[in-house]
UniProtKB/Swiss-Prot annotation:
The gene is dxs2. This is 1-deoxy-D-xylulose-5-phosphate synthase 2. It comes from Geobacter sulfurreducens (strain ATCC 51573 / DSM 12127 / PCA). It catalyses: D-glyceraldehyde 3-phosphate + pyruvate + H(+) = 1-deoxy-D-xylulose 5-phosphate + CO2. The keyword Cell cycle does not apply. GO terms for cellular component: cytosol.
Length: 626
């Protein structure tokens, strides 16, 4: 028997389906998402939670004429399946396949690229303003999760939208979670829910009737408004959004397609800013994901029946795990150490720290800007905060790094996870810019370990340093080296010669590139090319003395970094040589080009860009033949 899903090639195909057929389709979509994610990994639980919401939106609104803006994109899989990408869905998150996020280049139904949180309201408001300037009358809808509502930009968008009072629909998808459980006053506030969509129509009718009467009628209207505000404020979160200038409708069962459809049909007739509060269950339809939504938020391959995660090859602890263990040990001995995360306690390895030192652990929500300045405040009072954060998310707080940390030379440590290419999440999540944007900041120390043991010592170095310091490390397992129990700081700006070759080529490798550089050197040795390999350790401050010492002896310097070449470590070396007036040495920079790197497994991307051992050996072989 054929699936209804196989007959859905565009959102228009949903409009002729009955509510019962849409219910069947919802389950078919869930099964498709589970099947593909079990092989490819992906953001399973968020997408399972919004299937009915997605179908109702596409049934009522006419995409792409009507613009549906999805926040983050974690919940976009059902949207992709009903917008013409069913036949390619099996390629989700693979090299050359469809993205796990929204991509304008992929489909006209993806009206705004997404990957980071809290941007949808601002983007949708811009689309609505453009519509009005052009004299069009299409609808614009932003779909944002309650987790994304912990980000400040969401409120900047709400504030501006309420001021402009444009024809804009915001759907708040409330599953009481972002990645882990939500934190903060907003989460508590949203749990106070009771009202319905008929209130909007009723209020308009009453206002029209009383407003048309004499002064007594208008006074009654004022009293009624005050009474409504007082009572609603006791029971609902609607007051918050109405204070921003939005009409508030909800909460609505986000899995009731009929109710959702009815509500969206009514809202289509409104011409002002409306917020619809929808309640959903993260992971719905897959029992393991419903039971452990955080585990299945972003998950690797798993058994599609039991939900058991497919374990990779055994071996070394991940860099994230080693970081968490080392930080906990350091905090055991130093009461000044506190840990901060932006809604990712498990993803950044802080689970053991939060259990051991709950009073010194802070989850700030998806609020990176606040997190950095919060850390600065702690540091200003003598504490040693460690902000564990993914490289791509730290970008969101650049001015806070400059203004609130580095300007005052405050001792804040940034533990930058997921540096380099991260894999299938693609360009929004690769950590390929941190060396460039961090080394430009005065007072900032920037380190990258060659292995997980060196990571421990660099963490100790950063915490002991009386100023800002960053340690960047990759996603994935370490190299399996022994872990020292006693940790000591590394002298700032010192590198380490790991292989002293007799040839004229010196390789300066950063962090995760040290291992492939050594492998390449071993390969080339058998071909008569004897490389010197240096573990740089510090991108800032540079080991000026060592680098300059090789200038007179080496004909070629090769810098290798898992970062974009623009402004990175190789650029720092060139700047040093230019400042010193040094010539007579060829400098070749290996890294990522001036482009956004596509999705793919880490090993696939490193191979494609010549940054695995084979690629490095091949490029140096070519240089040596010149």
């Amino acid at each position: 028997m054929s699936r209804i899903l196989d007959r859905v090639d565009s959102p228009s195909d949903l409009k002729g389906l009955t509510t019962a057929e849409l219910g069947i389709l919802a389950e078919e979509i869930r099964q498709e998402i589970i099947t593909v994610c079990s092989r490819n990994g992906g953001h399973l639980a968020p997408s399972l939670g919004v299937v009915e919401l997605t179908l109702a939106l596409h049934r009522v609104f006419t995409s792409p004429e009507d613009k549906i803006v999805w926040d983050v994109g974690h919940q976009a899989y059902a949207h992709k399946l009903v917008t013409g990408r069913r036949d390619r869905f099996a390629t989700l998150r693979t090299l050359g396949g469809i993205s796990g996020f929204l991509k304008r280049a992929e489909s006209p139904h993806d009206v705004f690229d997404a990957g980071h949180a809290s941007t949808s309201i601002s983007a949708a408001l811009g689309l609505a303003a453009a519509r009005d300037l052009a004299g069009r009358n299409n609808k614009v809808v932003a779909v944002i999760g309650d987790g994304s509502m912990t980000g400040g930009i969401a409120y900047e968008g709400l504030n501006h939208a309420g001021h402009l009072n444009r024809d804009l629909v915001v759907v708040l998808n409330d599953n009481e979670m972002s990645i882990a459980e939500n934190v903060g006053a907003l989460s508590n506030f949203l749990s106070r829910t009771v009202t319905s969509e008929f209130v909007h129509t009723l209020k308009k009718d009453v206002e029209t009737f009383l407003g048309g009467l004499d002064r007594i009628g208008r006074n009654v209207l004022k009293v009624a408004k005050r009474a409504e505000e007082s009572l609603k404020g006791l029971f609902t979160p609607g007051m918050l959004f109405e204070a921003f200038g939005f009409e508030y409708i909800g909460p609505i069962d986000g899995h009731d397609i009929g109710r959702l459809t009815e509500t969206f049909e009514k809202v289509k007739r409104f011409d002002d800013a409306v917020l619809i509060h929808v309640l959903t269950k993260k992971g719905k339809g897959f029992a393991p994901a419903e039971a452990k939504p955080s585990l299945f938020h972003g998950v690797g391959p798993f058994d599609p029946v039991s939900g058991e995660i497919v374990k990779g090859k055994g071996g070394a602890t991940s860099y994230t795990g080693v970081f968490g263990q080392a930080l906990t040990r350091i905090a055991d001995e130093d009461e000044r150490v506190v840990a901060i995360t932006a809604a990712m306690p498990d993803g950044t390895g802080l689970g053991s720290f939060s259990a051991r030192h709950p009073g010194r652990f802070f989850d700030v929500g998806i609020a990176e800007q606040h997190g950095v300045t919060f850390a600065a405040g702690l540091a200003a009072e003598g504490y040693r905060p460690v902000f564990a954060i993914y490289s791509s998310f730290l970008q969101r707080a650049y001015d806070q790094l400059f203004h609130d940390v580095c300007l005052m030379n405050l001792p804040v440590t940034f533990a930058i996870d997921r540096s380099g290419v991260v894999g299938s999440d693609g360009p929004t999540h690769h950590g390929l810019f941190d060396l460039s944007y961090l080394r430009t900041l005065p007072n900032m120390v920037v380190m990258a370990p060659k292995d997980e043991n060196e990571l421990q010592h660099m963490l100790k170095t950063a915490i002991d340093h009386n100023g800002p310091a960053a340690v960047r490390y990759p996603r994935g397992n370490g190299l399996g080296v022994p872990l020292d129990q006693s940790l000591a700081p590394i002298p700032l700006g010192t590198s380490e010669v790991l292989r002293a070759g007799s040839g004229t080529c010196v390789v300066l490798a950063v962090g995760a590139m040290v291992g492939p550089a050594l492998e390449a050197a071993n390969t080339l040795e058998g071909e008569g090319i004897d490389l010197t390999v240096v573990n740089v350790r510090f991108v800032k401050p540079l080991d000026r003395e060592l680098i300059l010492s090789y200038v007179g002896r080496a004909g070629t310097l090769v810098t290798i970094e898992e970062n974009v070449l623009q402004g990175g470590f190789g650029s720092a070396v060139l700047e040093l040589l230019a400042d010193e007036g040094v010539g007579g040495v060829a400098v070749h920079r290996f890294g990522y080009p001036d482009r956004y790197v596509e999705q793919g497994e880490q090993h696939e991307l490193r191979s494609r860009y010549g940054l695995d051992a084979e690629g490095i050996a091949g490029r140096i072989r070519t240089l040596s033949a010149r």
